Amino acid sequence: METNNIRPDHVTCSIMITVMRKDGHSAKDAWEFFQRMNRKGVKWSLEVLGALIKSFCDEGLKNEALIIQSEMEKKGISSNAIVYNTLMDAYSKSNRVEEAEGLFGEMKAKGVMPTSSTYNILMDAYSRRMQPEIIENLLLEMQDMGLEPNVKSYTCLISAYGRQKKMSDMAADAFLRMKKVGIKPTSHSYTALIHAYSVGGWHEKAYTAFENMKREGIKPSIETYTALLDAFRRAGDTQTLMKIWKLMLSDKIEGTRVTFNILLDGFAKQGHYMEARDVIFEFGKIGFQPTVMTYNMLMNAYARGGQHSRLPQLLKEMTSLNLKPDSITYSTMIYAYVRVRDFKRAFFYHKQMVKSGQVPDPQSYQKMRSILDVKAATKNRKDRSAILGIVNSNMGLLKPKKGKKDEFWKNKKGQRRIQSFAHDG
């Protein structure tokens, strides 16, 4: 442009800042570019500053974005709904809802008309905070202003109810209300509903919702599959868990670490150690390396599947992968051996746990003590001795150190000794 003697203006500048943001340039780069353009005569404008604020907000630099908005207002450039929405969204996503509410109040006080996006930003924030009653009020306020709630508005409401165990029916009701007013559900809406059923323990309804979704031609996402898998993990239905996982693989949907842990835990808790191994193998193909948590769940699978003799081998595998066993690893092994009344091995791994400095938290310790106290009623003297060895050791929990002696009493004792020597002399 400049070689052809064409001077860039504020529109050119705002487009360039947007392109820079999308190409991965930092907010600092965008600010420096704007300053260069400003020196060349490009003035401050709503378009330019809106693009700059977006760049800063995307990097989480909310306070800096707020300073730019403040400077903009000082120069007589009023913020519009887009600028306010950008700022509110940044604060909401950082769980700073009070600041977002403050901007919402300022926006209305200055006569800037909120949009559907404005309300959806607040609804999304309150959804994450599990406050459906506030979302219900925002929906009413929105309608009073002549704005129609959309699919995102209702999805926030479904999600807010669905995150709470005893409100799954309210989530289902919100879903029906949405359909009643003619709004078509999206993948996000169905995922929120499936998650609600999962949390509420209604795994059959979760699967029905999944089937309805597919019937309506809506493609399930990884979030949908993860929510559905979690429903059947909670229900302990490993057969359907495997079926859903196979469906996911046939749809060529790659799992996440959350999906991996849900599947592994689901099979482990029912003692399906072969399936648990399959999960580790399949997810290993897409780069998910086993962690200490992975091995803890795998040990649980082998223990519950009656394969406690394989646990030492798993411990060796961990060492070969440079994974350090934690208190949960050792507790899992101790539980496994106590379950089959192999108290000697339980005591051995308890000693290993204490030796390695891996001490369970007080709650886990109390749980283990209560189990061992019951087992200590055994008539076998050797077994009883091994159990009491664990119980009485306080599981390696640190004993409170004695307080430092007061110097006065230390000297007093010394003085007595001196006096006694003097008398003896």
Give the role of each language-model region.
Residues 343-360, 373, 384-396:
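TPR/TPR-like (Sel1-like) alpha-helical repeat modules
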Residues 21-22, 57, 71, 92, ...:
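Non-globular disordered terminal and juxtamembrane segments underlying protein topogenesis/assembly
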Residues 33, 68, 103, 138, ...:
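Alpha-helical solenoid repeat scaffolds, predominantly canonical TPR units
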Residues 2-18, 22-32, 36-47, 60-66, ...:
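N-terminal targeting peptides
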Residues 27, 62, 97, 132, ...:
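TPR-repeat structural position
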Residues 9-14, 18, 30, 45-50, ...:
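Pentatricopeptide repeat
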